[in-house]
């Protein structure tokens, strides 16, 4: 049976791989950051239980990383429309690079947030003046994931520009 698809047959594979990469790698970063900083919060909570709610900030910041991957995965998956029957390799590669940019940036940010959050909440229990410094470092680590999200959106918007319309 002849195919009615006018693009490259393998192109949607790369597009969906980009969506999966964005979500999987971002969630891996979020999971690592949440687990690593959560261990620090639990250890600190034994000594200073009154600081637990204040020290939950790294856990929340790590959890947000998964949302960035979800956003890019949804953008990519809505860009893969089989009804148009024209999804080319350029589009698939653009979506793949978009997903990898967002996902790997989220993974690296999650690792940074986890390590800084773990050490930061433990140090905050002993010296409360370190809280502001910890928050600033966490913000810069979160910015890494935001850079990936922005680049992912830009790359994803490039898909579809290969068609002569």
UniProtKB/Swiss-Prot annotation:
Ranges facing Cytoplasmic side: 34-55, 118-129
Membrane-spanning segments: 11-33, 56-76, 96-117, 130-155
Keywords for the protein's UniProt record, in alphabetical order: Hydrogen ion transport, Ion transport, Membrane, Transmembrane, Transmembrane helix, Transport, Vacuole
Top-level taxon in the UniProt lineage: Eukaryota
Annotated GO MF terms: proton-transporting ATPase activity, rotational mechanism
SUPFAM superfamilies: F1F0 ATP synthase subunit C
GO cellular component labels: membrane; proton-transporting V-type ATPase, V0 domain; vacuolar membrane
Family in the record: Belongs to the V-ATPase proteolipid subunit family.
Name of the protein described by the UniProt record: V-type proton ATPase 16 kDa proteolipid subunit
Organism: Nicotiana tabacum (Common tobacco)
Lineage start: Eukaryota, Viridiplantae, Streptophyta, Embryophyta, Tracheophyta
